[in-house]
């Protein structure tokens, strides 16, 4: 018999747990149909943690049938008030288990427990509380007067069966943002975690069952993207798919939808987000925000301000202080245990990602001969895992691959601009449009930037501060659609128009 559970000990926090390893279908953990497994590795040590069941096409079909039966027979007939009760039950369980869930994120994704993983759980709790309280208060249609004898009304109805594919940089936070919006709207869900980071979502599935959600409403099927992701994208009985990940894979998901049943689609893809620092900004605060916006989560954030443009009159001063802040507050050396409060910058997710980021650093240093600053020598002495020191490249030209490509690590490029028009041109010169930030005390200038920048999110005098009530999504090649807030529910609803004729035959 395949192993469906294992015991995990986290001695640093005195946490012991029974970790599910199976596919979660119809509220039960089960083996994959072919018995294949995936080994998951602790990125802080490079050592294996455990192995979990890997779904295949047959398992996807099994999950779809479970989700379809649950939608047709139970969930579509469940009132919004009752859905809110289930989400409220889930909220209580998340609050009770938040340290365990955060610890699994630290173990499996390398997130520093105290400064990062616990913050993720706080955001998940906020999101769950929002949807639990709002689920029966959304506008689900409107009446439209037409003539004396005719009117129409609209109904917002769920799609039905929704597939969701979540990334490895925010495994549980992204899953909850997608899952809870879809559930609040009345859909059933099949969710695929990233193969690097499946443990927290599998454990979360136990809370789904405890919260009272009927069997088949939420199904968790870990596996490889090339197998499970492809099967979800092409399945003819899935009504909608939501994906977060790279732009390249997002394009494949879009193509799969077009080649199958034209399922509705939401994509949240890559970014190369700019942060603009004007000469009238509070320089110290701007530097603190910009450092946090690229080095937090080891730069593995789709909205990371990986391009920083500074007005030429304060450029040298900014660069000097930015390097000082990076060294003082974000240094990695000797802080290799993400469960230790001293660890602020964790490892990147895998050896593959480590090598990829390293190649960009080497290119910038040797091939492009850019000015470079790192908080520690690299490779870092004593590090067993995939640790990369915060890296700052300065005076970077627009032609540089480091400025054009999404590196997805603690690597930032800094360049200068002369005036507003110059800054805006530089900021918009990218195929991406996920997020942006501007630092200035000039209210008019700040709102002009918000108007003119081609990005789905704009932060003024801060960066990377997402809120549960606020829609999130990208422009251009950064995505299609929005999640979070009321819009995050509308995203999982479709509109039906009803025409009513009141005229009487004579």
Swiss-Prot record:
<dbReference type="InterPro" id="IPR016162">
    <property type="entry name" value="Ald_DH_N"/>
</dbReference>
<dbReference type="InterPro" id="IPR016163">
    <property type="entry name" value="Ald_DH_C"/>
</dbReference>
<dbReference type="GO" id="GO:0015940">
    <property type="term" value="P:pantothenate biosynthetic process"/>
</dbReference>
<protein>
    <recommendedName>
        <fullName>Aldehyde dehydrogenase [NAD(P)+] 2</fullName>
        <ecNumber>1.2.1.3</ecNumber>
    </recommendedName>
</protein>
<feature type="site" description="Transition state stabilizer">
    <location>
        <position position="169"/>
    </location>
</feature>
<dbReference type="GO" id="GO:0019483">
    <property type="term" value="P:beta-alanine biosynthetic process"/>
</dbReference>
<dbReference type="InterPro" id="IPR015590">
    <property type="entry name" value="Aldehyde_DH_dom"/>
</dbReference>
<keyword id="KW-0963">Cytoplasm</keyword>
<dbReference type="InterPro" id="IPR016160">
    <property type="entry name" value="Ald_DH_CS_CYS"/>
</dbReference>
<dbReference type="InterPro" id="IPR029510">
    <property type="entry name" value="Ald_DH_CS_GLU"/>
</dbReference>
<keyword id="KW-0520">NAD</keyword>
<dbReference type="GO" id="GO:0005737">
    <property type="term" value="C:cytoplasm"/>
</dbReference>
<comment type="similarity">
    <text>Belongs to the aldehyde dehydrogenase family.</text>
</comment>
<comment type="function">
    <text>Cytoplasmic aldehyde dehydrogenase involved in ethanol oxidation. Involved in pantothenic acid production through the conversion of 3-aminopropanal to beta-alanine, an intermediate in pantothenic acid (vitamin B5) and coenzyme A (CoA) biosynthesis.</text>
</comment>
<feature type="active site" description="Nucleophile">
    <location>
        <position position="302"/>
    </location>
</feature>
<keyword id="KW-0566">Pantothenate biosynthesis</keyword>
<feature type="active site" description="Proton acceptor">
    <location>
        <position position="268"/>
    </location>
</feature>
<dbReference type="Pfam" id="PF00171">
    <property type="entry name" value="Aldedh"/>
</dbReference>
<dbReference type="GO" id="GO:0006598">
    <property type="term" value="P:polyamine catabolic process"/>
</dbReference>
<dbReference type="GO" id="GO:0102244">
    <property type="term" value="F:3-aminopropanal dehydrogenase (NAD+) activity"/>
</dbReference>
<dbReference type="InterPro" id="IPR016161">
    <property type="entry name" value="Ald_DH/histidinol_DH"/>
</dbReference>
<keyword id="KW-0560">Oxidoreductase</keyword>
<dbReference type="GO" id="GO:0004029">
    <property type="term" value="F:aldehyde dehydrogenase (NAD+) activity"/>
</dbReference>
